[in-house]
Each structure stands twice: as structure tokens, then as C-alpha cells.
């Protein structure tokens, strides 16, 4: 009888320890996931929207429907005949074509 009682106490102790470890792992995973979501949300707030200037931050454009917008630059001649580079976030032509094909496919195949 003492052996069964000792074995039962040992089994309950091991079970509670293993379940506590599993809960700690789940809590850590939840915290990591929450921090990841917060970081992504902050990155979205800091990104440059479509058609806005990205001359100083060429890699900071936001995401579009399917692709991330790209910083597209052009050379502008000012009234004083100086050439300056102006950049804006936009969708490149090959991304526009891909979005058109995907949209067309969604309309046909539902």
C-alpha cells in the first residue's frame, strides 16, 4: 500500500511539473507571437503609402494588395536648370500585370 501511495504521489508530481512546463512554453509562444504582431503593426505605421515621396527612405514603402510598393525615381529639372531626383512609392508595371491576371482569375474561377 505504501508503494502504491508513493508511486501515486510521484506520478502526480511528474504530471504537474510537465504540465507546468507545457504551460510555460505556450505562454512564451503567445508572448512571442504578440510581440511579433506588435512589431509588424508598428512597421505598417512607419511605412510610406502609395503615391507619397520616398526619396529619403527608398525601402520604406507599404504593402499593396499582393506586392510591396516599390520606390520609383525620376529625374526632375527645376526652374534653375538643376536636375534633382524625386521618388514615390508605386506599383511597377510587372506587378500591375500580375495583379490584373490574379483579379481576372478570381472573377472567372470564383
Curated annotation (Swiss-Prot):
Residues 1-20 form the signal peptide. Keywords: Disulfide bond, Knottin, Secreted, Signal, Toxin. The keyword Lyase does not apply. GO terms for cellular component: extracellular region. It is found in: Secreted. Disulfide bonds join 47-62, 54-71, 61-89, 73-87. The keyword Nuclease does not apply. GO terms for molecular function: toxin activity. Expressed by the venom gland. InterPro entries: Spider_toxin_CSTX_knottin, Spider_toxin_CSTX_Knottin_CS. Residues 21-44 form a propeptide. Its main location: secreted. Belongs to the neurotoxin 19 (CSTX) family. 03 subfamily. The presence of a 'disulfide through disulfide knot' structurally defines this protein as a knottin. This is U1-lycotoxin-Ls1cc. It comes from Lycosa singoriensis (Wolf spider).
Amino acid at each position: 500500500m505504501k508503494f502504491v501511495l508513493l508511486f501515486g504521489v510521484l506520478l502526480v508530481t511528474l504530471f504537474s511539473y510537465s504540465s507546468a512546463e507545457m504551460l510555460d512554453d505556450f505562454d512564451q509562444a503567445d508572448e512571442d507571437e504578440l510581440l511579433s504582431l506588435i512589431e509588424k503593426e508598428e512597421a505598417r505605421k512607419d511605412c510610406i503609402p502609395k503615391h507619397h515621396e520616398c526619396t529619403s527612405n527608398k525601402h520604406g514603402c507599404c504593402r499593396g494588395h499582393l506586392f510591396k510598393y516599390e520606390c520609383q525615381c525620376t529625374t526632375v529639372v527645376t526652374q534653375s536648370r538643376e536636375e534633382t531626383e524625386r521618388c514615390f512609392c508605386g506599383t511597377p508595371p510587372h506587378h500591375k500585370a500580375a495583379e490584373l491576371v490574379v483579379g481576372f482569375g478570381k472573377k472567372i474561377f470564383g
